[in-house]
């Protein structure tokens, strides 16, 4: 995702896919793992996670790491799973 772009549903789906993989495998992810897997910078991940959290798509333990918000042990919520299902149904 370009640095100057606001997260959209496709960005959320991309990010949620990474969170879901970690959630399902029992190896929760954090900001740095998402950044590495998607090729995004940490500021972009933080921005996307902030919106995902506001939309109740993810849950995670917030830490003091920067750039904020930084989450450890991210999990996908029911709402996040619904977004993934609706996006895959529309694809």
Region spans (language model):
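Short alpha-helical segments that sit at the start of domains
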Residues: 1-16
């Amino acid at each position: 995702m370009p640095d100057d772009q606001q997260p959209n549903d496709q960005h959320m789906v991309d990010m949620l896919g990474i969170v879901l993989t970690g959630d399902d495998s029992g190896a929760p992810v954090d900001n740095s793992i998402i950044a590495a897997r998607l090729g995004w910078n940490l500021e972009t991940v933080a921005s996307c996670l902030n919106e995902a959290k506001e939309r109740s798509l993810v849950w995670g333990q917030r830490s003091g790491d920067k750039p904020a918000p930084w989450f450890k042990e991210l999990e996908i919520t029911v709402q996040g799973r619904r977004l993934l299902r609706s996006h895959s149904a529309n694809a």
